[in-house]
Amino acid sequence: MQISVNEFLTPRHIDVQEVSPTRAKITLEPLERGFGHTLGNALRRILLSSMPGCAVVEAEIDGVLHEYSAIEGVQEDVIEILLNLKGLAIKLHGRDEVTLTLAKKGPGVVTAADIQLDHDVEIVNGDHVIANLAANGSLNMKLTVARGRGYEPADARQSDEDESRSIGRLQLDASFSPVRRVAYVVENARVEQRTNLDKLVIDLETNGTLDPEEAIRRAATILQQQLAAFVDLKGDSEPVVVEQEDEIDPILLRPVDDLELTVRSANCLKAENIYYIGDLIQRTEVELLKTPNLGKKSLTEIKDVLASRGLSLGMRLDNWPPASLKKDDKATA
């Protein structure tokens, strides 16, 4: 078989072997030497990091103020319950976020099937265990389920509104990806006299909310869309330049009252026109000690409170104050 130098082989044999409803092996051959690893690695990374899905992002459990708690009559502690909630395989039809409720009394096992669902919400693994209840135990909770992509830690979803949310609303790190495991191997393939070709075998397992075949299609589509820009390297004729302020940590925009300092320390800071945490961290210890009525005890208190938030005195902020922070805001702080 004669092939032009500029001509590349494309897979002519594609086989999909369904190992189980959630697992499949996809075989593609032949591929030019080296393309097995090139395509296999790219698809694997997309499948693991970029597939959209749904996950529990927040839980509110009756009688629980923080995750380091235990519930009377419940075998698992709160951390174990939150970990079990991460194992739920959920599908949302038509909505990006929904709040679900669960209420059950013991004795017995609490499973995903005990969650009260809306008409457009589906839980694939209804037998998934959430907790075990004793005779005197009960579990009541509200779950916020959201749509997302890949993995997203709870800190990444923090906003100004979250600072004022009620105590007891527990944020979860969310793994939205419906793909549980991906592995690939590259084997030798042969076409007539050519023996230096690749055969790509992808072993893919999902959580049941997405068919393995469909997962491969979506990953390939994402890769195709990203590579399309390289086919024609002509961007917009006139690139749009967007002037943007440097991002400022939201905690620096919060008033010093949020630090919950003693009344004496707080009043001393306001007397020096220090209204925001961003104002405070730019002051040095020497400068603060010159403040009337602010002694070493108050200084130590301020340093400890800042340290608990990963901050310290004497920090430099080149873009402070931001343009969005009006001067008259300080007068009302």
UniProtKB/Swiss-Prot annotation:
Full protein name: DNA-directed RNA polymerase subunit alpha
Subunit structure and binding partners: Homodimer. The RNAP catalytic core consists of 2 alpha, 1 beta, 1 beta' and 1 omega subunit. When a sigma factor is associated with the core the holoenzyme is formed, which can initiate transcription.
UniProt free text on domains: The N-terminal domain is essential for RNAP assembly and basal transcription, whereas the C-terminal domain is involved in interaction with transcriptional regulators and with upstream promoter elements.
Alphabetical list of InterPro entries matching this protein: DNA-dir_RNA_pol_insert (IPR011262), DNA-dir_RNA_pol_RpoA/D/Rpb3 (IPR011263), DNA-dir_RpoA (IPR011773), RBP11-like (IPR036603), RNAP_asu_C (IPR011260), RNApol_insert_sf (IPR036643)
Catalytic activity: RNA(n) + a ribonucleoside 5'-triphosphate = RNA(n+1) + diphosphate
Enzyme Commission no: 2.7.7.6
Organism expressing this protein natively: Ectopseudomonas mendocina (strain ymp) (Pseudomonas mendocina)
Function: DNA-dependent RNA polymerase catalyzes the transcription of DNA into RNA using the four ribonucleoside triphosphates as substrates.
HAMAP family referenced in this protein's UniProt entry, alphabetically: RNApol_bact_RpoA
Sorted UniProt keywords: DNA-directed RNA polymerase, Nucleotidyltransferase, Transcription, Transferase
GO MF assignments: DNA binding; DNA-directed RNA polymerase activity; protein dimerization activity
Entry GO terms, CC: cytoplasm; DNA-directed RNA polymerase complex
